[in-house]
Amino acid sequence: MSDNKNIRDIGTFFNGYAAEFSSIYLEDERPRSLFNKVMDRLFRKDIETRLVDSLNHMRKDSIKTVLDIGCGPGHLVVKLLELNKDVTALDIAPNMLEITQMRVDSMKLESNFKTILADYSEHEFDEKFDAISVMGFFDYVEDPVSVLKKLLNDASKEIYISIPGDKGFLAWQRKVRYKRRNCPLYLYSKESLEQYPY
């Protein structure tokens, strides 16, 4: 695991949060409280939107190999495997990868799939990927420029990125909630991203 304390803290947080996080996508895996159901409906629609948008782009026949960085509990991974893509799922939380592996195993698909337990910024690949999905990942990236440069090196065709905004109620409550749980969180505005030299 990473020598970076922030990365270790993020991995620890998501390792403990894996089952609950997975239930945001699929409630039948773990029932959600009424409060969480309301929060999901009001403030977490972007999770589903990102998933659908990413899939719509990656359906192309030209996209054969996909790296899902910060794969979480594997919801995008499963959808990509259903599209017969070769998928590499990378995460820093072992429990997230375990949930992903169990979900993939239950599908009984003949596909090329593997998991990698690593900090993306420190992991070197032997191959380039046709597409890289980076959804819900930059929330935990302190240095976005170095990650963006690495993405450009690791992708041969396309990169799908979502970058969290720093405004509104959802951003505010996430800042409070994650600080209480000792999980570093990085939110960005257009202006803050423009300050980085590309």
Language-model features, listed with the residues they occupy:
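A conserved beta-strand element that flanks and buttresses the S-adenosyl-L-methionine
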Residues: 133
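Class I SAM-dependent methyltransferase SAM/SAH-binding core
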Residues: 75-109, 114-120
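Conserved beta-strand signature within the Rossmann-like core of class I S-adenosyl-L-methionine
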Residues: 156-164
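Short alpha-helix
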Residues: 184-198
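Conserved class I S-adenosyl-L-methionine
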Residues: 2-59
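Class I SAM-dependent methyltransferase "Motif I" SAM/SAH-binding loop
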Residues: 70-72
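A short, conserved alpha-helix within the catalytic core of class I
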Residues: 141-150
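Short, glycine-/aromatic-enriched active-site segment of Class I SAM-dependent methyltransferases
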Residues: 164-184
